[in-house]
Amino acid sequence: MAATTTLRSPKIPHPPPESTPSNLSYLSQISLTPVPKRRRFISIYACSNAESNSQFGSEIKKSQAIELNKVSDEHPYEFNSKDSPNPLPRPLTSADLSNMATEGSRLRVAYQGVRGAYSESAAEKAYPNCEAVPCEQFDTAFEAVERWLVDRAVLPIENSLGGSIHRNYDLLLRHRLHIVGEVKLAIRHCLLANNGVKIEDLKRVLSHPQALAQCENNLTKLGLVREAVDDTAGAAKYIAFQQLKDAGAVASLAAARIYGLNVLAQDIQDDSDNVTRFLMLAREPIIPGTDKPFKTSVVFSLDEGPGVLFKALAVFAMRNINLTKIESRPLQKQALRVLDDSADGFPKYFPYLFYVDFEASMADQRAQNALGHLKEFATFLRVLGSYPSDSGIA
């Protein structure tokens, strides 16, 4: 029978805010409010070294699912660790936070995917010696941080070949997490297969859609049918647990080691300069400084009108602030706006949110002046984070 531990969620006093620029607002309080008489599952995987021959998608011990069940007001939260020897640690309390520096507690860092994912490598690069906690979905990682189940999340935001991860841009706006850093990781894809399987035996290859797209030319030369799955390491785990002889996986060297697969070919990506940028997310912003290169990320919306976007970008140019990225996303729940100011018809346009990264710290007066200027004509403005830039690629 699965061991069940019921934890009541304490009201956690929020740490007193320190002196920061006004653009970086702190959350007033963290509390976990249960939904009465309704069950909701958040699947977070807790890693285990136990061996298992279970099929992919069933209850497996190498990467065991932890279910967080909202059951009622009387029993706010239950953790069901199905035969897992390493259940997810309890949520942090304010006492935990104060003891972390003195006792050397390991940070718990959420990432999307299963063990062997590139995101796991990014989490370990961002926070060496951390306890990496795999999550089933991007949403789960955001919620895990907000609910104090983990301390940080490291999630991809863009790839040099595949472009932006639009889902995570939308989640940044829906949640109140702060960007506290970035990490860039070189992506080196490998073609993996089970023991005894040769390249000529393969008929199909499984991986994440972006990984398949990044290796398109090489996979086409091999004549392999491409099948998309949720993540690269998940593909490796699937062919290993199913003992497939006609299928390979595009994944990392780490995934090959974890799931006992042979590496048939290395560096099969079409472009050797394949880099993914990950964001480091936390419940609280960091205090920006000027002692090292900083980057600031903001999101804003604008009213309609000629030259409005030009004016918005000009507030940075006139202060000699370099923009490193601009991304537009349709405004949720307002996908289409109709104007009736013309007798000839109803002009339609899509209102957009603009995500901008620029090279300046919020401790820099230029950045504060630029955002103050932008706020004069922006209909919405939010600072997502001001954090040290990552210039190194590993």
From Swiss-Prot:
Name of the protein this chain belongs to: Arogenate dehydratase 2
PANTHER family: AROGENATE DEHYDRATASE_PREPHENATE DEHYDRATASE 2, CHLOROPLASTIC, PREPHENATE DEHYDRATASE P PROTEIN
InterPro entries per record: ACT-like_dom_sf, ACT_dom, Preph_deHydtase, Preph_deHydtase_CS
Entry keyword set: Amino-acid biosynthesis, Aromatic amino acid biosynthesis, Chloroplast, Lyase, Phenylalanine biosynthesis, Plastid, Transit peptide
The encoding gene: ADT2
Broad class of the protein's primary localization: plastid
Taxonomic lineage of the native organism: Eukaryota, Viridiplantae, Streptophyta, Embryophyta, Tracheophyta
Record GO biological process: L-phenylalanine biosynthetic process
Localization in the cell: Plastid, Chloroplast stroma
Occurrences of domain ACT (ranges): 297-388
Tissue: Expressed at low levels in petals (corollas and tubes), stems, leaves, pistils, stamens, ovaries and sepals.
Molecular function terms, GO-annotated: arogenate dehydratase activity; prephenate dehydratase activity
